[in-house]
Amino acid sequence: MGVYILRRLVSTIAVMAMVGIFIFLLLRLAPGDPAAVIAGPTATEQMVANIREELGLNEPLPVQFVHWASDVLRGNFGASVFTGVPVLQLLSQRLEPTISLSVLTMILSVTVGVSFGVLAAWRSGGFVDRALATFSAIGYSVPVFVIGYILIYFFAIQTRWLPVQGYTSINQGVAPWFLHLILPTVTLSVPYIAFIARITRGSMLEVLSEDYMRTAAAKGASPFAMLFHHALKNAGVPILTVIGISFAYMIGGVVLTETVFNVPGIGRLVVDAIKNRDYPIIQTVLVLISGLYVLINLLVDLAYTLIDPRIRY
């Protein structure tokens, strides 16, 4: 196990190095100039050139990359080119809404998705199974922002049951915090519920056809014990993989969802940074997301040994 973890850590360093190079080049080669955005539409070429020099954008790309990479290795992710506020400080101010939305979405997606998939497999071809097929088709095909606007129209504008937009900190009360997160959470959960449910159903169907499941039924095991003690445990590896992938990919959905519901989280910060060509913010967020994705994959691989003792590294 120790050798495997060490090998994965070494490969992680290599992956993060390549990701850093790709992110740096992608932003630098993309259209747009942060100096021109800062200077404004009425600025002269000399003013833009002076700002580029202040930001170090007039240096060769290899030199810019070395400066940026060395700062990152020291834990210095720079400051916003517009506000001058350190990037980590900006992220810490936006962290609570994003974490709240992500955690609630993951809880809802896993709970409903796994339960839906188990029931669909247990009654394959029945009403629940057909309902899952319909729901999955909708969840896969309809964009997150469309789902968000539909929910806003029915549950916020027409019925006025829930807030339309915005966010209330949990420090100001659990009830308003939760009410403001219901619509964003449901919106972001729809595609992940569909994804997790379909994979759970397929994995459960494969396990339910095994001989030991028929043996358990012959011994008088209850349906609950057969489903959740025997079948779900043995079907857990692909389900855990899907949950890990869903959590890692959720960041992209968070950006759209926070924009639709005007949630002041990291997603909104990234959108504003892209509009303003604020390189330090974009680079930092992309690097942190990449690191989180790699870490989640490592944790999922290690969790396999807890679900299935036959797996050894």
From Swiss-Prot:
Q: Which GO biological process annotations does it have? A: amino acid transport
Highest taxon listed in the record's lineage: Bacteria
Q: What is this protein called?
A: Probable peptide ABC transporter permease protein y4tP
KW Transit peptide (keyword) present: no
Query: Could you tell me where this protein is found in the cell?
Result: Cell inner membrane
One of the record's GO cellular component terms: plasma membrane
Per the UniProt record, the source organism is Sinorhizobium fredii (strain NBRC 101917 / NGR234)
PROSITE patterns assigned to the protein according to its UniProt record, in alphabetical order: ABC_TM1 (PS50928)
Annotated membrane topology is: Multi-pass membrane protein
Coarsely, its chief localization is: membrane
According to the entry, every stretch annotated as the ABC transmembrane type-1 domain falls at 95-300
Note whether Mitochondrion occurs among the keywords. no
Describe the function of this protein: Probably part of the binding-protein-dependent transport system y4tOPQRS for a peptide. Probably responsible for the translocation of the substrate across the membrane.
Q: Which SUPFAM superfamilies match?
A: MetI-like
| Family membership | Belongs to the binding-protein-dependent transport system permease family. OppBC subfamily.
From the UniProt record, which GO molecular function terms apply?
Answer: dipeptide transmembrane transporter activity
Membrane-crossing ranges are: 9-29, 101-121, 137-157, 177-197, 236-256, 280-300
For this UniProt record, the keywords arranged alphabetically read as follows: Amino-acid transport, Cell inner membrane, Cell membrane, Membrane, Plasmid, Transmembrane, Transmembrane helix, Transport
